[in-house]
């Protein structure tokens, strides 16, 4: 009897031990299942993120959707966004041609203003000298031939001075403010051209074609300016020998002396 009771006690203890082990294993398996579920969910999310990552290649490509330029914020997630990017690239290159035209026009403005200032000052001084020479010529009508020749020489000298004022081709040095404006325009041109170069380095065929289109349109619009192919001549001849009408027909600049 004692032996049977001892066996029954041992069996009961074994049963309780197995029950505790099973409960512990079930308790440990619960966090593991939760962790595996979380890990699987993380893998799904990572797969979704990888599907919409930027496509960048250093070789020639035709990427449209998921293409990125200059920054991860410039991420084309649809064809409409990529079309807008292409239009923006075209406008950027057109803006570059516009800045170049503005730079040329500003340089021409500086030259015109400086030469007009010099012509005004020289013409004023020459007109005064020519007036004095004309008055002396009128008073020397009854004087000897030697005096008359001296007066005519002085009149011709004043006329040549007037002509030199109109044919002044000396280089013009900009002022400090004008040079600051020129440097600012050059900086803007350099910055826009640098961004265009960075866009071309993505080797996207559509973007490169848009750069070419923008260069064509910009040159067509902002390089459409008069071409000074004919040289302008200043001819210091008296009015009776070369009327002003003939000068205009020949495209020449004639100055009355």
UniProtKB/Swiss-Prot annotation:
<keyword id="KW-0406">Ion transport</keyword>
<keyword id="KW-0813">Transport</keyword>
<comment type="similarity">
    <text>Belongs to the copper transporter (Ctr) (TC 1.A.56) family. SLC31A subfamily.</text>
</comment>
<keyword id="KW-0812">Transmembrane</keyword>
<feature type="transmembrane region" description="Helical">
    <location>
        <begin position="79"/>
        <end position="99"/>
    </location>
</feature>
<keyword id="KW-0472">Membrane</keyword>
<dbReference type="Pfam" id="PF04145">
    <property type="entry name" value="Ctr"/>
</dbReference>
<comment type="function">
    <text>High-affinity copper transporter of plasma membrane that mediates copper uptake under low copper conditions. The mechanism driving the transmembrane transport of copper has still to be determined. Acts as a potential virulence factor.</text>
</comment>
<protein>
    <recommendedName>
        <fullName>High-affinity copper transporter ctrC</fullName>
    </recommendedName>
</protein>
<dbReference type="GO" id="GO:0005886">
    <property type="term" value="C:plasma membrane"/>
</dbReference>
<keyword id="KW-1133">Transmembrane helix</keyword>
<keyword id="KW-0187">Copper transport</keyword>
<keyword id="KW-0186">Copper</keyword>
<dbReference type="GO" id="GO:0005375">
    <property type="term" value="F:copper ion transmembrane transporter activity"/>
</dbReference>
<keyword id="KW-1003">Cell membrane</keyword>
<feature type="transmembrane region" description="Helical">
    <location>
        <begin position="202"/>
        <end position="222"/>
    </location>
</feature>
<dbReference type="InterPro" id="IPR007274">
    <property type="entry name" value="Cop_transporter"/>
</dbReference>
């Amino acid at each position: 009897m004692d032996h049977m009771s001892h066996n029954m006690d041992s069996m009961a203890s074994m049963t309780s031990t197995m029950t505790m082990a099973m409960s512990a294993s079930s308790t440990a398996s619960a966090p593991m299942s939760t962790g595996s579920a979380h890990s699987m969910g993380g893998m799904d999310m990572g797969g979704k993120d990888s599907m919409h990552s930027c496509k960048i290649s250093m070789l020639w490509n035709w990427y449209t959707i998921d293409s990125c330029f200059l920054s991860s914020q410039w991420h084309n997630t649809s064809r409409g966004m990529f079309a807008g990017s292409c239009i923006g690239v075209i406008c950027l290159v057109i803006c570059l041609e516009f800045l170049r035209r503005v730079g040329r026009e500003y340089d021409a403005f500086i030259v015109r203003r400086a030469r007009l200032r010099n012509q005004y000052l020289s013409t004023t001084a020459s007109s005064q000298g020519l007036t004095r020479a004309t008055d002396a010529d009128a008073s020397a009508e009854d004087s000897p031939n030697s005096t008359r020749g001296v007066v005519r020489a002085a009149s011709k000298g004043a006329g040549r001075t007037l002509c030199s004022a109109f044919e002044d081709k000396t280089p013009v040095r900009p002022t400090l403010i004008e040079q600051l404006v020129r440097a600012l325009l050059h900086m803007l041109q350099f910055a826009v051209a640098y961004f265009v170069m960075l866009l071309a380095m993505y080797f996207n065929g559509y973007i490169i074609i848009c750069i070419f289109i923008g260069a064509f349109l910009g040159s067509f619009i902002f390089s459409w300016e008069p071409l000074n192919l004919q040289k302008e001549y200043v001819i210091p001849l008296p009015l009776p020998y070369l009327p002003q009408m003939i000068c205009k027909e020949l495209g020449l600049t004639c100055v009355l002396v």
